[in-house]
Design a protein with these regions (language model features):
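Alpha-helical bundle regulatory/interaction domains
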Residues: 1-146, 153-154, 160-162, 168-172, ...
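Conserved structured core elements
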Residues: 190-193, 222
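Long, low-complexity intrinsically disordered regions
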Residues: 159-162, 176-181, 188-191
Length: 252
């Protein structure tokens, strides 16, 4: 499971407003100090101390208080779907309290465990067992879905969904249904997310945005700009100019 889950501590000493871009993972976060809000200005809403953000189609703005420390678990939606009691399309583009999915007692225990791990200075990886106790793994019944994900990634998001379903020996409607309930997106949307990730992977080796668009799997510059704007709120030129000094990471 280690290749499907990443876990780390995040410590923001100063108040911070930051944007999270769509990525291929969902995020479970537990604040051991401080709080995080979703949105900015009058529209902001304080999130619960233990929450989950599903797979995103567009950018999300978060605000962290001074001295906020969080344990963050990045997890593939396919794996998460075997741990939670609701279809993944119910948590797409949403940030929910873990109490919406599990008992109050279980979440209180999890928060206490994470606070103890913080106090003891434990490595993030040592706390993973606490999440595994809360989230027992159900059996994988739709074996074609992990295969579909691998093929979409292997093609860099340039794959026909009808042909993919045929190669996997399932109907296109079964593939679509499986993706919505287990990933939270349609196969086409997921392929778009893979292409979006390619932009950051190939950015440093591309000599121009035109070359980058083709390398990342977009069929022309207009397609690239349109899709990039949907996922960031900016044109590629604007975004890379503003983020020239930042590490290119599409997650927290």
């Amino acid at each position: 499971l280690s290749d499907l889950i990443r876990i780390s501590w995040s410590h923001k000493e100063s108040p911070d407003t930051y944007t999270v871009l769509p990525g291929e993972e969902c995020v479970i976060g537990v604040q051991t100090k401080g709080r995080i809000s979703l949105g900015s200005g009058k529209q902001s809403k304080t999130l619960s101390k233990a929450g989950i953000t599903g797979i995103l189609r567009g950018p999300r703005t978060f605000i962290s208080e001074k001295n906020t420390k969080s344990l963050l678990v990045y997890i593939s939606p396919l794996l998460l779907s075997r741990m939670i009691p609701v279809p993944m399309d119910q948590i797409s583009d949403s940030s929910l309290s873990l109490e919406d999915l599990f008992s109050k007692e279980a979440i209180s225990g999890l928060i206490a465990d994470c606070e103890e791990a913080d106090w003891k200075g434990q490595e993030a990886s040592l706390t993973l067992e606490k999440f595994r106790r809360l989230l027992p793994l159900k059996e994988e019944k739709e074996k074609f879905l992990p295969q579909a994900i691998l093929r979409i990634k292997g093609s860099l998001g340039e794959i026909g969904i009808k042909g993919l379903a045929s190669d996997l020996g399932v109907s296109q409607s079964s593939l679509e249904r499986g993706f919505r309930s287990r990933v939270g997106l349609s196969p086409k949307e997921y392929a778009g997310l893979v292409r979006f990730g390619n932009i950051f992977r190939f950015y440093n080796s591309s000599s121009s945005l035109t070359e980058l668009a083709l390398e990342a799997g977009y069929y022309d510059q207009a397609h690239f700009i349109r899709e990039f704007k949907k996922k960031t709120g900016f044109s590629p030129k604007q975004w890379f100019r503003q983020n020239a000094n930042l590490g290119l990471d599409s997650n927290f």
